From Swiss-Prot:
Main EC class the enzyme belongs to: oxidoreductase
GO molecular function: oxidoreductase activity, acting on paired donors, with incorporation or reduction of molecular oxygen
Protein family membership: Belongs to the TrhO family.
Name recorded for this polypeptide: tRNA uridine(34) hydroxylase
Catalytic activity, as annotated: uridine(34) in tRNA + AH2 + O2 = 5-hydroxyuridine(34) in tRNA + A + H2O
Alphabetized CDD domains for the sequence: RHOD_YceA
PROSITE patterns attached to this UniProt entry: RHODANESE_3
One Pfam family this sequence matches: Rhodanese
Protein function: Catalyzes oxygen-dependent 5-hydroxyuridine (ho5U) modification at position 34 in tRNAs, the first step in 5-carboxymethoxyuridine (cmo5U) biosynthesis. May be part of an alternate pathway, which is able to bypass cmo5U biogenesis in a subset of tRNAs under aerobic conditions.
Domain Rhodanese: 146-240
UniProt KW keywords: Oxidoreductase, tRNA processing
Organism: Escherichia coli O127:H6 (strain E2348/69 / EPEC)
EC number: 1.14.-.-
Amino acid sequence: MPVLHNRISNDALKAKMLAESEPRITISFYKYFHIADPKATRDALYQLFTALDVFGRVYLAHEGINAQISVPASNVETFRAQLYAFDPALEGLRLNIALDDDGKSFWVLRMKVRDRIVSDGIDDPHFDASNVGEYLQAAEVNAMLDDPDALFIDMRNHYEYEVGHFENALEIPADTFREQLPKAVEMMQAHKDKKIVMYCTGGIRCEKASAWMKHNGFNKVWHIEGGIIEYARKAREQGLPVRFIGKNFVFDERMGERISDEIIAHCHQCGAPCDSHTNCKNDGCHLLFIQCPVCAEKYKGCCSEICCEESALPPEEQRRRRAGRENSNKIFNKSRGRLNTTLGIPDPTE
């Protein structure tokens, strides 16, 4: 029986990936379709992906698959062919190719079975996730942006919206997708006569959100096919104005794809224009925040003077402090007043 999970340390895997000479392509895809046996499907896909030297993060559930991966450039077409042949539901599936890619997005393959491929918190048995809004292509998106009767709803988290969004798009203030869904319905109650356009990074969240809005009585609902990634790619290919402003946050080592030259966010420490996310270098914190180069040098990559001081302590003392600290993984985010319980890059499906 082949080993169906990784047994090598993260540090060793990352060093191996960085030493590779062959370029890699970062790809994301999702598909809502019924998987009768997610565990068996997971194991079969794990072997397929491993044979093609694919890295990344893949979730499977009875409702479908959600993947963000890195594929050696020479294996991309083989990967595409084998994925399409794996299940009839995956034939012709759109693969979102990263826009701003250094090929160093992932260094390990993690494939998990979950209850949902997106944590939505929906327990309504009458909800039909297949009853989605209409797709919008790039030219149609631009036309909608000029339509005074249309409202664009950003179905991403605050830290994503902060560094980039469509012109005049509304933010749904929440830290997780499951919190956003009821808030979106509540915020839009007075606008049921409007055209609601929903979007996210690659399409998976806004597709489900469009179905949720329709379930709650909204009839004029659209969502952007392929999300921000596919919109920007098609707009550029077709010579259309790209109406997304700033950077598209992505959930891998890159932490962002530059879409436009505008920098709309600010350093959380000094307020200078900046849209570069980082994780606090203090191993007892790892808060995701925006930090400019000046503050990165001043605070040694940490989010505060306290974390800077703690990260300079001997490793044993740092471990002792972390072990004795209650709720050590709940770090207050001064920029938003929220608790961050994630160490490292956030999970896009939460």
